[in-house]
Amino acid sequence: RCSTAYAVERTATETFSTNPSKIRKRLLLTDEMRLIMMFEDSFPSGGFIDCIDFLKPLERTSAAIDLLSLRKLRTMLDTLRKVTAFFSSVKDGVYPNLKRMSAGILSFPEIHRRIDNIIDRYGEVKDTASDELYNIRKSLREKEGAISPRMSAILKKA
């Protein structure tokens, strides 16, 4: 069963084949993945997110990404990193077809680093995401700090 709309779409485009080499290749890939799912605990089992819907609009120069989509992108990049690390760590000859297939995957470390500069590990926007945001949040904390003693004094008098 497919976990993303893209995967459903991709499998729907698969066609019947009578080509022996194509059939052999598909069977080898399927068997390697079956073995991974059965025996490899270090292979990621989640985090496969279809990002196309929110990445496509970012091709425009004035586009922006919302926080939820940024969280999803980070999750997908983490999963991608884990998948490539898994295949890099397996010995040559083990899962050779999937390993070869994963060799061309790009991990986009700069994008990952930029996301980590914007959101924390809980997916919340960091105060330091921008200088302007830092100043706004600092000002709010100072005002909250000034209001708190006044509220306490008013409540004590009441």
Stretch-by-stretch model annotation:
Residues 1-140:
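Conserved amphipathic alpha-helical "coupling/scaffold" segments
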